[in-house]
Amino acid sequence: MALSIGAACGSNDAAPAAAASPAAPVTTSEVTGTVPRNAIVTLMPAEPVPMPAGPAVMDQYSKTFVPNVLYVRVGQPVEFRNSEDMPHNVTVIRRGSGTEVFNVSTEPQQKYVHTFDRVSQFDVTCDIHPGMQATLIAVQSPLATVAGDDGRFTLSNVKVGSYKLSLTFEGRTVEQPLEVSQARTEVRVSP
């Protein structure tokens, strides 16, 4: 499987200006592409990105996980709260492998803290209330998303610069350098 990376400029349908003025330098880009479906797409900046100051939070409220999709950094504590007056539990299973990471009871107004140690997607459920479901995605960088079922993804407002592009899918990770220097950078994975 190979990565194909190209730069594309956005279209400009406006009429040309009477006098040409210097173009403003590109400072941010949109990184788009087609990769394996449901792959975790991560851009790692050349400079380290500080870990968020506090834990990420997934709450149990009104028989719902809030938020129902949560991105966290690998190594960042995640606080699973129960803000209700009824007991719940939190079961976390690694998507793809079916490996149970943990299954803990969360009593009313209590919390459980866990730190994820690898890039992966996780299914979060409550065994007591089967309708409660969420997704947790652990990533190395705040510049991350999950490709859709069609393999398409978009990362907006990416600063121009050097990155390591990381794709995690089907239990493996593929990495390659990526230079973001255009208004739009296109990424494709070809077999």
Task: Enumerate the language-model features and the residues they cover.
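Extracytoplasmic copper-binding redox domains, predominantly the cupredoxin/blue-copper superfamily
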Residues: 9-191
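Bacterial N-terminal signal peptides
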Residues: 1-6
